[in-house]
Amino acid sequence: MSLIIVLVISVLSADAVLSMDNELYLNLEPSQRSSWPVARAVRMQFSKRSEGGRESRKMQGCQILESLNDIAREALRTPRHTTKRISKDEMEFFEGRCLSVGESERTVLGTKWCGAGNEAANYSDLGYFNNVDRCCREHDHCDNIPAGETKYGLKNEGTYTMMNCKCEKAFDKCLSDISGYFTRKAVSAVKFTYFTLYGNGCYNVKCENGRSPSNECPNGVAEYTGETGLGAKVINFGK
């Protein structure tokens, strides 16, 4: 199931006769390579004119966004109360009005690990924002339950990979500890996209029979917290 959201911003001219509507349609789909969703968005601009009590609307521009960095930037500057959900058919209608685009980056700009999958050549390969990338790399290799699989007695019946809550907390802390003005911009994009826009929730593991001398939890039982973000809630709805 896909998530479709429309974020609407209206900018009125001084005489309120002509206005510009900027609409962002967002589609999140499951990734087979990581816990991150594959994000796709369409930003469209319409001019709206009101004359003699009648309104007319004309498309002025269209852009398909596949970069998490661009999508996060658009979502961050859009008031949350203007977020609306539309149907998949409506999304396909607007996509059909845009020109096809080639493959776009699916990681946050300046990183190789922060996104659906990764662009790294090897484990040591990091992007420009290497400190942010280290956080994402560790998160990618942390304890998880892939979609459809069972671990700790918990079956992941959702669409996305489910992460251990300890991994989510460590990821959030790792990002929060990063300083630097420009780096913080990348941190904001990563945190907003993953925790707020997506928000798949996580699972806690209880060691009912205690831990082993090596601190392992061989008979652990996991409990899912439930989705925390609008993206995961809509996509997993009805599963």
Swiss-Prot record:
GO terms for cellular component: extracellular region. Gene3D superfamilies: Phospholipase A2 domain. GO terms for biological process: arachidonate secretion; lipid catabolic process; phospholipid metabolic process. SUPFAM superfamilies: Phospholipase A2, PLA2. Ca(2+) binds at W113, G115, G117, D140. The keyword Metal-binding applies. Residues 20-105, 211-213 form a propeptide. It comes from the Eukaryota. It is found in: Secreted. Residues 1-19 form the signal peptide. It holds the Pfam family Phospholip_A2_2. Expressed by the venom gland. One of its GO terms (molecular function) is toxin activity. Binds 1 Ca(2+) ion. InterPro entries: PLipase_A2_dom, PLipase_A2_dom_sf, PLipase_A2_His_AS. Belongs to the phospholipase A2 family. Group III subfamily. Toxic phospholipase A2, which may catalyze the calcium-dependent hydrolysis of the 2-acyl groups in 3-sn-phosphoglycerides. Inhibits both skeletal (RYR1) and cardiac (RYR2) ryanodine receptors (calcium release channels). Probably blocks ryanodine receptors by generating a lipid product. This is Phospholipase A2. It comes from Hoffmannihadrurus gertschi. The lineage of its organism: Eukaryota, Metazoa, Ecdysozoa, Arthropoda, Chelicerata.
